[in-house]
Regions:
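Short S/T/G/P-rich N-terminal loop/turn motif that feeds into the first structured element of a domain
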Residues: 1-147
Length: 147
């Protein structure tokens, strides 16, 4: 995963990457099958690169307004933030789907178990009776491979 402060920084990184690929003997192919998502950071509390991240993606009912979808995303984000501590909330900017992403860090899988249990407890107390209109949800755990 990559983070950019703004689209100007993204453009500078991409320009350098494309120049590096075209100046070598052949372009580097790093991925087999993937999709790129450029997101807008709505709230940033994850300021250091943790060993692992939980990336949770939420799509809400298309009948909701953009503000209603944001409201639901914020409700879920608050649960993750309280349970995991440092988390980021991002929203689709460019890419294949209109989603909200909640990204939280953890040190190891013991830490994940503790933070997950805390989040589950908070969710059960605060959102079990909420109509959140979640259409699709997925989670991915990613490991940091370099600093």
């Amino acid at each position: 995963y990559c983070n950019f402060d703004d689209m100007k920084q993204f453009a500078a990184v991409m320009k350098k990457s494309i120049a590096a690929q075209s100046s070598g003997p052949s372009p580097v192919q790093s991925y087999a099958s993937h999709s790129d998502n450029i997101v807008a950071v709505l709230e940033r509390n994850l300021t250091e690169a943790p060993n692992y991240i939980l990336n949770s993606e939420y799509n809400f009912g298309p009948y909701l307004t953009a503000n209603e979808q944001l409201d639901r995303a914020n409700k879920l984000y608050n649960v993750y933030k309280e349970g995991f501590g440092a988390c980021n909330l991002t929203q689709h900017r460019y890419g294949p789907e209109y989603s909200f992403y909640i990204v939280c860090g953890f040190d190891d899988f013991d830490d994940f178990a503790k933070k997950s249990a805390k989040s589950d407890s908070i969710y059960e107390k605060s959102l079990m009776d909420e109509k959140l209109d979640i259409k699709v949800h997925s989670d991915n755990m990613l490991i940091k491979v370099m600093d």
